[in-house]
C-alpha cells in the first residue's frame, strides 16, 4: 500500500522571517500516524499548537498565516509546499517566533533539510483527497479551480504589465507524474517590486526581505546579480505557493488545480468551498501502490 510518511530524524534550521525580520529557530520532528502537520510555538508558555488546516488560515496578506486564539504562525506556504512535494504527512514543527524562516525565498532549502532528515514510511495507509467535480471561486478577474484529474496537476497563469514579465512565459502547467517538483518547482523564489517595498515596510511587512531571499524587480529589470533560476521562475513560484496552500487540506491531492492570478486568499477560499461541498471530493487510500495515480520519490535513507 501507499503508506503515510514522517521524518526519520529531527532536523533544525535558523533563519529570519520574511515579514517580521525576526530571527527564528525551527525544529522539525517526526510525528505519529494521522497527526498531520502541527506547528508549535515553543516560545510561548504554555506552548501553543496549531494544526495545518484550511480553516486555521486567518490572514492571507502576502502569505498564508495560521491563527488560533490570537497566536500566529506566518508564511507557512513554502515549507508546506516542500512537505507536499515529498509526500510527508506527519510532523511537528517547532518555532521560536510567529513566522517561518524565509530561507532563500523558495522551498529548496526545506526540501534539502527534509531529505537530510530522511523520510520514513509508517504503518498506515496514506490518505488522498480525490476531486470528483469542478469547483471554482472567483474574485474580480482572478480564479482558482479544481477539476477531476487522474494524478496531480497544477496549471497557473499570471498577468503583469511589466517589461520583465512580458518577455517571459506567464503560464506554466505541470503534471507531477512526469515532472519532478524538486527539480522544476522547488527552487523558484518569491518575488517583489521595489515600488512596493517601501509601502510594505511602512506596514511592518517584508522587513526581512532582500535579494538574498527574493527576486527583486524595479521598473525595468531584475536587480538580482545572478538573474533567474528558471526562465519562468515567477509563475513557477506562484505554483509553489499554490501547492503549499493546497496542502492545508491535510492530504495529498488527486486532481488538477488551475489558477489565474490567484493568491493566498483565493487559494484558501477554494479549499473552504471544496470542504463545504461534501460531494465534490472523497478521501481514498491505495492498498496497491501500482493503482495510485500519484507517486513519490522513494524514502531517502538518511545516515542512521
Swiss-Prot record:
Q: Which reaction does it catalyse?
A: a UDP-3-O-[(3R)-3-hydroxyacyl]-N-acetyl-alpha-D-glucosamine + H2O = a UDP-3-O-[(3R)-3-hydroxyacyl]-alpha-D-glucosamine + acetate
The record's Gene3D superfamilies line, in alphabetical order, gives: lpxc deacetylase, domain 1, lpxc deacetylase, domain 2
Keyword tags: Hydrolase, Lipid A biosynthesis, Lipid biosynthesis, Lipid metabolism, Metal-binding, Zinc
Q: What is its EC number?
A: 3.5.1.108
Q: Which GO terms describe its biological process?
A: lipid A biosynthetic process
In its UniProt record, a GO molecular function of this protein is: metal ion binding
Q: Which GO terms describe its cellular component?
A: membrane
Its top-level enzyme class, in one word, is: hydrolase
Which domain of life, per UniProt? Bacteria
Which Pfam family, an example, fits this chain? LpxC
The entry marks the following residues as binding Zn(2+), namely 78, 237, 241
Q: What does this protein do?
A: Catalyzes the hydrolysis of UDP-3-O-myristoyl-N-acetylglucosamine to form UDP-3-O-myristoylglucosamine and acetate, the committed step in lipid A biosynthesis.
PANTHER family listed in its UniProt record = UDP-3-O-ACYL-N-ACETYLGLUCOSAMINE DEACETYLASE 1, MITOCHONDRIAL-RELATED
Q: Which family does it belong to?
A: Belongs to the LpxC family.
Task: Cite the HAMAP family for this sequence.
Answer: LpxC
Instruction: State the protein's name.
Output: UDP-3-O-acyl-N-acetylglucosamine deacetylase
Q: Which organism is it from?
A: Alcanivorax borkumensis (strain ATCC 700651 / DSM 11573 / NCIMB 13689 / SK2)
Amino acid at each position: 500500500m501507499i503508506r503515510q510518511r514522517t521524518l526519520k530524524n529531527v532536523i533544525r534550521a535558523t533563519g529570519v522571517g520574511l515579514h517580521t525580520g525576526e530571527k527564528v529557530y525551527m525544529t522539525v520532528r517526526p510525528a505519529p500516524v494521522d497527526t498531520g502537520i502541527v506547528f508549535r510555538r515553543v516560545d510561548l508558555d504554555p506552548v501553543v499548537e496549531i494544526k495545518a488546516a484550511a480553516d486555521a488560515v486567518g490572514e492571507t496578506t502576502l502569505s498564508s498565516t495560521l491563527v488560533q486564539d490570537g497566536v500566529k504562525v506566518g508564511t507557512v506556504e513554502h515549507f508546506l509546499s516542500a512537505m507536499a512535494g515529498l509526500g510527508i504527512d506527519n510532523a511537528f514543527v517547532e518555532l521560536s517566533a510567529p513566522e517561518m524562516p524565509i530561507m532563500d525565498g523558495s522551498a529548496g532549502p526545506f526540501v534539502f533539510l527534509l531529505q537530510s532528515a530522511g523520510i520514513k514510511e509508517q504503518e498506515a495507509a496514506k490518505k488522498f483527497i480525490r476531486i470528483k467535480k469542478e469547483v471554482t471561486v472567483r474574485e474580480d478577474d482572478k480564479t482558482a479551480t479544481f477539476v477531476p484529474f487522474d494524478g496531480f496537476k497544477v496549471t497557473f497563469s499570471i498577468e503583469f504589465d511589466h517589461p520583465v514579465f512580458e518577455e517571459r512565459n506567464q503560464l506554466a502547467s505541470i503534471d507531477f507524474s512526469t515532472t519532478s517538483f524538486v527539480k522544476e518547482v522547488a527552487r523558484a523564489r518569491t518575488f517583489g517590486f521595489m515600488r512596493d517595498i517601501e509601502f510594505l515596510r511602512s506596514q511592518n511587512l517584508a522587513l526581512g526581505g532582500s535579494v538574498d531571499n527574493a527576486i527583486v524587480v524595479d521598473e525595468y529589470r531584475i536587480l538580482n546579480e545572478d538573474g533567474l533560476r528558471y526562465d519562468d521562475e515567477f509563475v513557477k513560484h506562484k505554483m509553489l505557493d499554490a501547492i503549499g496552500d493546497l496542502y492545508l487540506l491535510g492530504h495529498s491531492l488527486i486532481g488538477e488545480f488551475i489558477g489565474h492570478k490567484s493568491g493566498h486568499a483565493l487559494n484558501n477560499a477554494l479549499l473552504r468551498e471544496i470542504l463545504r461541498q461534501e460531494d465534490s471530493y472523497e478521501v481514498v487510500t491505495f492498498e496497491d501502490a501500482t493503482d495510485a495515480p500519484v507517486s513519490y520519490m522513494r524514502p531517502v535513507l538518511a545516515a542512521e
